[in-house]
UniProtKB/Swiss-Prot annotation:
Signal peptide: none annotated. Residues 287-297 have a biased composition (Polar residues). One of its GO terms (molecular function) is protein dimerization activity. Changing G67D: In strain: Isolate TS54. Component of the RNA polymerase II (Pol II) complex consisting of 12 subunits. It comes from Schizosaccharomyces pombe (strain 972 / ATCC 24843). The gene is rpb3. Keywords: DNA-directed RNA polymerase, Nucleus, Transcription. This is DNA-directed RNA polymerase II subunit RPB3.
Length: 297
């Protein structure tokens, strides 16, 4: 029986990748999902300096919308000037071209109609593609930022920085990461609620075509673990979906390598009762409140 982990790509597009992960455990599949969601670095607007804002949009709402605009994060892990450093690792005081990208937005409505401001109207100071707003196609204007009426104006400067979604969701390269296992429910991990017929009232997913259906009355093992997972990753556009998975696997490997190294270097020491100064008949009050008195250990 093959014990090596395999990845079979079923479908890949500009914004999503659908694949099958086999010969692995539920823990590994979920770890990969969590890494892809929160550990892959991207660039996003982190600071907004508003000079003028006479629109109906409050400053904090405007800053929040700007922060959630997906920005091109290709090659962000490369050394500057191709990529970016984390601000916390940079030698500068606050931000600099090595750890940030500047974007500007200046707009004023002079006509009688409504002027719509989109992500495409953001001007990036750098010559590289890093930090540019993601557009679905050349004709697209990107997400709507705000609307201006006559004589209303906004003028601001944005500082985009490198980060991960563990710090804030705006740095997440994905909009959704999901996986399914055992589409026929052979392991009986799911109890279906139904009125008459469970098969008729619970349609099978497309993943059921990749497995043999169970025979009627087929026995099952409660302790059996799933070994095949159907994963679907949807990108926000800042990083291609195939690159998201490559980076996710690399980051997961690095985390496991650090864990193994630390376990090898530091062996846990077992302390005796004497070393802990714990006497067998020591009087301890384990009540968390001590009748209103201060705890003393």
């Amino acid at each position: 029986m093959d014990s090596e982990t395999h990845i079979t790509i079923r479908n890949i597009s500009k914004n999503s990748v659908d694949f099958v992960l086999t010969n692995t455990s539920l823990a590994v599949a979920n770890s990969l999902r969590r890494v892809v969601l929160a550990e892959i670095p991207t660039v996003a607007i982190d600071l907004v300096e508003i000079n003028v804002n006479t629109s109906v949009m409050p400053d904090e709402f405007l800053a929040h919308r700007l922060g959630m605009i997906p920005l091109d994060s290709s090659n962000i892990d490369e050394p500057p000037p191709v990529g970016l450093e984390y601000t916390r690792n940079c030698d500068c005081d606050q931000y600099c071209p090595k750890c940030s990208v500047e974007l500007f937005l200046n707009a004023k409505c002079t006509g009688e109609g409504t002027m719509e401001i989109y992500a495409r109207d953001l001007v990036v100071s750098s010559n590289s593609s890093l930090g540019h707003p993601i557009l679905a196609d050349p004709k697209s204007r990107g997400p709507l930022i705000c609307k201006l009426r006559k004589e209303q104006e906004i003028s601001l400067r944005c500082i985009a920085k490198k980060g991960i979604a563990k710090e804030h969701a705006k740095w997440s390269p994905t909009s959704a990461v999901a996986f399914e296992y055992d589409p026929w429910n052979k392991l009986q991990h799911t109890d279906y609620w139904f009125e008459n017929d469970a098969d008729a009232e619970w349609p099978k997913s497309k993943n059921a075509d990749w497995e043999e259906p169970p025979r009627e009355g087929e026995p099952f093992n409660f302790q059996e673990e799933p070994r095949r997972f159907y994963m679907d990753v949807e990108s926000v556009g800042s990083i291609p979906p195939n690159e998201i998975m490559v980076q996710g696997l690399r980051i997961l490997q690095e985390k496991l390598a650090v864990l193994v190294r630390d376990l090898d270097e530091e062996q846990p020491t077992q302390l005796s009762a004497n070393e802990l100064n714990m006497e067998e008949n020591a009087e301890m009050n384990w009540s968390p409140y001590q009748n209103g008195e201060e705890n003393t250990w």
